[in-house]
């Protein structure tokens, strides 16, 4: 149990409250830029290939100094170092938190309970690479001798969101002769649509479940097995050539019919939402190849080292985490928008939703006390420019404080025609324009100068002062994707450390799963389920009455 003062009673916290109520009671970005001609150059930080411009935030040098004092007081750096050392900072499950070990170099030494875990990590990576090369080259064939043309990844949560996001992000680097599809929802329509046009003889299923008991995943895997056997004359031997497992439960894997030689393990010190650079990334490795996958890992490691070694004033994940605390706790912001100006990052924000909201969606601190401060925000967003024609109206003229990240790349991906590549300038013009419009808005006088009728002026005025971070990189590559993900991983860590919550458990996921197991017999068999509230009992009854048999 900690004997340190509660967060909101720390002097560093109250100083920030006073700062917000005093000099930053009514912050104006136009005034902040006018007062500091070098602001645009000074408020930039670099991490690897990423350039972060945070000049359009409602902060001053004093704000940054006070936030850094809060980080020091809450021992963000001590907890960071403990994580990298392999200490068990996941206090509710008594586990180490070592997703960083998944991208450590071969010669690194990272111990858990006295054992260096790095050799095991690289042993699995080497096995993954061998298997991926065999599938990609056609050496690995299906039961009938046909080459594998489609990989179907079946998982849920971290076993789906990460690989699916990265596959879309790196589609330009994939082997176009082989495609990957992802199935996660226990809704049978998900699997149906994924396999309806596939040839079982050319399909490989990757089943991702650490325990091999995850109900949604095993339900889908069992249905996929039935689909496969129906298409291959019911020969049970076919399963071993068309299914591989990402799991640690050899018994369950073997019972399913999968050869345990094709089971790829991972460890309990890797949380699901941090796991796609482990064996969970096998489908991605098959798609982009082992060399590109290792470039992805290198990108992760670049920002890991940046977070571990960069000074506070130049530490990008620390800065993003502090800004999130600033807006959530001192401006009342309830959400955070992540707006990538890249079609390839169409699933990036959905991935960050789990990373951030499952990590920091907590209401008790590490000592089990209810928190008295805001914790994790709602994370949302879609790629630009689509969002501009949907919800940017609220960002520009709504009443809520919504910090946003604008993510863009200076160069388009290779492989586009000259005409399509030229559209990239228009895409990025929109990114830069939105950052300016959100920050500086448009005054009434500026509107009047355009000859707008006076009665229209209030409707066409934009107050600005909407904070954004602009993140730029030269182009979207496997390494840059790894850097982006690690940037957000460590940002989430910083916020959890300041809020004194356990960012690495997810007990909130469990309750609904337990109740679903109890409710299902009432739907399928009409069994009585004790403990149902009247509303849920009535819903179950209505379902049974109208369910088609």
Curated annotation (Swiss-Prot):
The molecule here is called: Glucose-6-phosphate isomerase 1
Q: Per the record's keyword annotation, is Glycoprotein included, yes or no?
A: no
Task: Look at the named UniProt entry and state the broad enzyme category this protein falls under.
Answer: isomerase
A GO biological process held by the record? gluconeogenesis
UniProt catalytic activity: alpha-D-glucose 6-phosphate = beta-D-fructose 6-phosphate
GO MF annotations for this entry? carbohydrate derivative binding; glucose-6-phosphate isomerase activity; monosaccharide binding
Catalytic center residues: 358 (proton donor), 389, 513
Q: Is Cytoplasm among this UniProt entry's keywords?
A: yes
Any one GO CC term of the record: cytosol
Listed pathway(s) = Carbohydrate biosynthesis; gluconeogenesis; Carbohydrate degradation; glycolysis; D-glyceraldehyde 3-phosphate and glycerone phosphate from D-glucose: step 2/4
**Per its database record, what is this protein's job?**
Catalyzes the reversible isomerization of glucose-6-phosphate to fructose-6-phosphate.
What are the leading ranks of the lineage?
Bacteria, Bacillati, Actinomycetota, Actinomycetes, Kitasatosporales
Q: Which UniProt keywords apply?
A: Cytoplasm, Gluconeogenesis, Glycolysis, Isomerase
HAMAP family for the chain:
G6P_isomerase
Tell me which EC number(s) this protein carries.
5.3.1.9
Q: Where in the cell is it found?
A: Cytoplasm
Residues annotated as transmembrane: none
